[in-house]
Curated annotation (Swiss-Prot):
This is Argininosuccinate lyase. CDD domains: Argininosuccinate_lyase (cd01359). The lineage of its organism: Archaea, Methanobacteriati, Methanobacteriota, Methanomada group, Methanococci. One of its GO terms (molecular function) is argininosuccinate lyase activity. It comes from the Archaea. It comes from Methanococcus maripaludis (strain C7 / ATCC BAA-1331). InterPro entries: Arg_succ_lyase_C (IPR029419), Argininosuccinate_lyase (IPR009049), Fumarase/histidase_N (IPR024083), Fumarate_lyase_fam (IPR000362), Fumarate_lyase_N (IPR022761), L-Aspartase-like (IPR008948).
Length: 481
């Protein structure tokens, strides 16, 4: 029976109501965090002489036993509502209410669960960052391998300009790099302590909030008690990051599906990430990319659901907030699975260099450089050059001839001239690529420089990540030893 019902409400509660309101199904995500929170709070109560050292030590020792036992071995009676009451009930069974009942002094489940969520989520954010770093490293290997592999870039999914496949991969690395930065920034706002805010107005007991902050490895405290128990913006921010990353990853999945089709035929997805048809024996379907693309789209829905739950809630704690948690954890685990799938597919793709080169050499992908050459060599305005080359392309299509066959005629009509060498260079797709060696360009030496720059950033990320993981591990070691 839930000990909270002995007073005001009485012991009777309908079974369907208990099952409807319990959060035990998803409280497994905060079980260890709740133990840490309990130990830190009890330690502080001892130090502040709010409870006796004797009682406090008994509580802490029993909490460590519960941690070793694991949540799955506890009495998960739905009438207990949540993991907080399950743990407190276990303590009372072993120590009696006169001892165990002192642990919750000066604390509410409101600040307790807010603390637990932050403790658990900070670990998951670090895990996500770790997976992203691994994926980024693998993408850089692919980019380096193909820094001279000629291909064509697209706008509107229409062939646009020559690039290298290494440069194309770096475009995704660049986006992932921003995602990593966003998660690191969010970590700082997750890692602040609401513990000590109590129900919503702190407490008359002489608590030391800075001490529990220190014990739990938080960077700071949320000072305002009402904000402390109600704030879930750190969850929304994390889920927004997850949604943005999911959108970036979905673009990769889309390219894997499209570029591996027979019509494009520029890459081949490894067999282990594909399936065949139940009726068409020739088929090699990009199922993993498709399923990943679909799963990533659900992340947007989870974010909107959480925002909708939170919209217009009265200030401080409302039980509605409980329903945020399953959407958060589903987003986290879906994202981690999808990162690993995308990483695996990118790391194992086969690149059809000949097909990529063939695509770059047709459909007028060098037209922009031809216009640029007219500007540089003939001194005309770019808009005029744009019109001349546009006319060349139009005539080439209509008359079914190569640009080389009619360019001299068109230039002469416009009182312009170019040497054959300049024309050949302008129309050569790889020469186009080599010319584009400005920062962020596709020239092989610039791609190589960019890869080196990203590797330097990764080294910094890894150091930062290792430092934060060590901080979290130290908290666990100190409190659970």
């Amino acid at each position: 029976m839930n000990i909270l019902r002995r007073g005001r409400l009485g012991s009777n509660v309908k079974e369907d109501v208990m099952k409807f309101t319990t959060s035990l199904e998803f409280d497994k995500e905060i079980f260890e965090s709740d133990i840490l929170c309990d130990i830190a709070h009890t330690t502080m109560l001892i130090e502040q002489n709010v409870i006796s050292e004797e009682n406090g030590k008994k509580i802490i020792a029993e909490l460590k036993k519960i941690a070793e036992k694991g949540m799955e071995n506890l009495d998960l009676d739905p009438s207990l509502d949540d993991i907080h009451m399950v743990i407190e009930s276990e303590l009372i069974k072993e120590l009696g209410e006169d001892v165990a009942g002192r642990m919750h002094t000066g604390r509410s489940r409101n600040d307790e669960v807010a603390t637990d969520l932050r403790l658990s989520l900070r670990k998951k954010v670090l895990e996500i960052i770790g997976h992203l770093i691994t994926m980024e490293q693998n993408m850089l290997k692919v980019s380096n391998e193909h820094k001279e592999t000629l291909t064509v870039g697209y706008t509107h999914l229409q062939q646009a300009q020559p690039v290298t496949f290494g440069h194309h991969i770096l475009s995704h690395v660049s986006a992932i790099e921003r995602d990593i930065s966003r998660f690191f920034d969010t970590y700082n706002r997750i890692n602040i302590s609401p513990l000590g805010c109590s129900a919503m107005a702190t407490t008359g007991f002489n608590l030391n909030r800075k001490r529990t902050q220190e014990l739990l490895g938080f960077y700071d405290i949320i000072e305002n008690s009402m904000d402390g128990v109600s704030s879930r913006d750190f969850i929304v921010e994390t889920m927004a990051n997850i949604s943005m990353l999911g959108t970036n990853l979905s673009k990769i999945c889309e390219e894997l599906v499209v570029f591996s089709s027979a019509e494009f035929n520029t890459i081949e997805i490894a067999n282990e990430y594909t399936s065949t048809s139940s009726i068409m024996p020739q088929k090699k379907n990009p199922d993993v990319a498709e399923i990943t693309r679909a799963k990533l789209s659900t992340l947007n829905g989870e974010l909107v659901t959480v925002l909708t739950i939170m919209k217009a809630l009265p200030n401080t704690y409302n039980r509605d907030l409980q329903e945020i948690s399953p959407h958060l954890w589903k987003s986290v685990y879906t994202l981690i699975d999808c990162i690993q799938m995308v990483d695996g597919m990118i790391s194992t793709i086969k690149v059809n260099k000949e097909r990529m080169k063939e695509n770059a050499e047709k459909n007028y992908s060098t037209a922009t450089e031809l216009a640029d050459t007219l500007v540089r060599e003939c001194g005309i305005a770019f808009r005029m050059a744009h019109g001349i080359v546009g006319e060349l392309v139009k005539r080439s299509i209509e008359e079914k001839v190569e640009i080389k066959e009619i360019i001299l005629e068109v230039l002469e009509k416009n009182n312009l001239s170019l040497s054959q060498e300049k024309i050949d260079t302008a129309l050569d797709p790889f020469e186009n690529v080599k010319l584009r060696n400005v920062i962020g360009g596709p020239a092989p030496e610039e791609v190589e420089r960019a890869i080196s720059s990203f590797n330097t950033k990764i080294s910094t990320h890894k150091e930062k990540l290792d430092e934060k993981i060590a901080e979290v591990n130290t908290v666990n070691k100190n409190l659970l030893k």
